[in-house]
């Protein structure tokens, strides 16, 4: 009689429990104690209008070209990428215009990394950075992470800045870097190029102009990039995350004098920009007219949103970006939460009493309007203007 041996089943191996050490037990740098990681809420809700993304993905034709480019790049992923991102810099120079050469371009993983490189090169211990609030909430993070002293001064009552206001603050603070954001986030207000021209003429400090939303302005060609031949200490920072609908691609860039680019290369990590990032960005730039085709529509959506919000008795900051800052609520969090409960995510950011919403698709914008109309009758009272 044949006996069949029973095969024993492998016993499940118990996974070891993670070490129970607490964050408070780690030898953190003192400025990190009690801090929280930066990040806007990423929630799975029907309508997300909170991080100023372009709501329209790249077209099928663009996606196919990106897939081909990535497949080609994958054949050599065993090799390090082009450290200088030569082709990408040439493509960016062609897109920008203004007679810019590739030696004046510095690309990195989003404008976040570009800004960090700038502060690593020109900020750091014993140095300071000046900017004007309210403004982008990542700026203090850049300063903290590069050990740069972060100094702010307020914007004026119109959320703008004049030449005298900027130069007076520079004279008072004597910063190593001054950061001017136009259009500003979260207000959407701009600083005229003529003002930036006068500021650069009146100071020897490094002047950084953040133009992340420049393509959404009524006159996108009116850029501080035009001033670069005059001022060797001017740096203009841009991104493909917004108008180019490439937030997931993580590609930002600086435009400056070649010597400034040399300085930024000193502090970059080796091979900082992957082959995949480079080829995807190059495809996007090759399709620039198509990638930017929705910008006019989003600009119109933003303008219509401003009118609609004002029509319903809300205070609105006139914007030159793809978002609108509106209020003013006694308890803005209650309004934010009520909208979220209705499946609409916007941003609780900026001056007291205000909320920010970005331009979406027609369906998304309609959903926001419907939800807000439902919330407004029971919303906390508007903050009186004189209390601002």
From Swiss-Prot:
It catalyses: L-histidinol phosphate + 2-oxoglutarate = 3-(imidazol-4-yl)-2-oxopropyl phosphate + L-glutamate. InterPro entries: Aminotrans_II_pyridoxalP_BS (IPR001917), Aminotransferase_I/II_large (IPR004839), HisP_aminotrans (IPR005861), PyrdxlP-dep_Trfase (IPR015424), PyrdxlP-dep_Trfase_major (IPR015421), PyrdxlP-dep_Trfase_small (IPR015422). It comes from the Bacteria. GO terms for molecular function: histidinol-phosphate transaminase activity; pyridoxal phosphate binding. GO terms for biological process: L-histidine biosynthetic process. Its EC number is 2.6.1.9. Its cofactor is pyridoxal 5'-phosphate. The modification N6-(pyridoxal phosphate)lysine is found at residue 242. The keyword Transferase applies. Pathway: Amino-acid biosynthesis; L-histidine biosynthesis; L-histidine from 5-phospho-alpha-D-ribose 1-diphosphate: step 7/9. PANTHER family: HISTIDINOL-PHOSPHATE AMINOTRANSFERASE, HISTIDINOL-PHOSPHATE AMINOTRANSFERASE-RELATED. NCBIfam families: hisC, PRK03317.1. Belongs to the class-II pyridoxal-phosphate-dependent aminotransferase family. Histidinol-phosphate aminotransferase subfamily. This is Histidinol-phosphate aminotransferase. It comes from Cutibacterium acnes (strain DSM 16379 / KPA171202) (Propionibacterium acnes).
């Amino acid at each position: 009689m044949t006996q069949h041996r029973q095969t024993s089943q492998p016993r499940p191996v118990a996974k070891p429990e993670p070490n129970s050490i607490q964050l408070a037990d780690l030898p953190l740098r003192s400025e990190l104690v009690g801090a929280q990681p930066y990040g806007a809420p990423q929630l799975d809700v029907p309508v997300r209008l909170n991080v100023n993304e372009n709501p329209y993905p790249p077209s099928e034709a663009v996606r196919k070209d990106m897939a081909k480019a990535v497949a080609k790049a994958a054949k050599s992923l065993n090799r390090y990428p082009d450290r200088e991102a030569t082709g990408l810099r040439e493509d960016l120079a062609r897109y920008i215009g203004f007679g810019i050469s590739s030696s004046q371009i510095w690309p990195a993983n989003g404008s976040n990394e570009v800004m960090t490189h700038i502060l690593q090169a020109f900020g750091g211990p014993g140095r300071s950075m000046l900017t004007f609030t309210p403004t982008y909430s990542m700026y203090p993070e850049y300063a903290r992470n590069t050990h740069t002293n972060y100094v702010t001064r307020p914007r004026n009552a119109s959320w703008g800045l004049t030449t005298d206001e900027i130069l007076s603050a520079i004279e008072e603070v004597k910063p190593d870097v001054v950061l001017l954001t136009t259009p500003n986030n979260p207000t959407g207000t701009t600083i005229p190029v003529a003002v930036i021209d006068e500021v650069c003429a009146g100071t020897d400090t490094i002047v950084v102009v953040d133009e992340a939303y420049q393509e959404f302005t009524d006159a996108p060609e009116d850029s501080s990039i035009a001033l670069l031949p005059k001022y060797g200490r001017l740096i203009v920072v841009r991104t493909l995350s917004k108008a180019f609908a490439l937030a997931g691609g993580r590609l930002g860039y600086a435009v400056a004098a070649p010597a400034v680019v040399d300085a930024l290369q000193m502090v970059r990590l080796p091979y900082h920009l992957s082959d995949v990032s480079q080829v995807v960005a190059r495809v996007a730039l090759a399709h620039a007219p198509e990638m930017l085709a929705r910008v006019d529509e989003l600009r119109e959506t933003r303008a219509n949103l401003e009118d609609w919000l004002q029509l319903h008795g809300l205070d609105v900051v006139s914007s030159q970006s793809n978002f609108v800052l509106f209020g003013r609520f006694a308890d803005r969090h209650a309004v934010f939460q009520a909208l979220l409960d209705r499946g609409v995510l916007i941003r609780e950011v900026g001056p007291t009493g205000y909320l920010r919403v970005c331009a979406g698709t027609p369906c998304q914008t309609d959903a926001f309007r419907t939800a807000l109309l439902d919330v407004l009758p029971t919303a906390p009272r508007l903050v009186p203007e004189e209390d601002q």
